[in-house]
């Protein structure tokens, strides 16, 4: 499935029925991508890529968002020139009940145990 905005640009996303558990777990296994998902879950809103203050290059940031999108964890759509990112919570909950909340809770416990050094702040 692709999303096309007025700009005519489209981004591929897996349909709900094509989201695979191993792809979701792989996407969430990277600390940077997990932090992106934690921030999206905390904000409960769409955020632009530039709102994430990640300590990596733009190309690496793009890679992380692509992995999250292609795994079905996030949906990216263009709104004008901005690429908006939203968590596909409903799709993930439908396919893997409780998985996302369990992972987010475990990540919160780990961040508390390891301190703020384990947290990647988001700008915004």
Regions found by a protein language model. Name each.
Residues 69-74, 83-86, 102:
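A general structural signal for short secondary-structure boundary/capping elements
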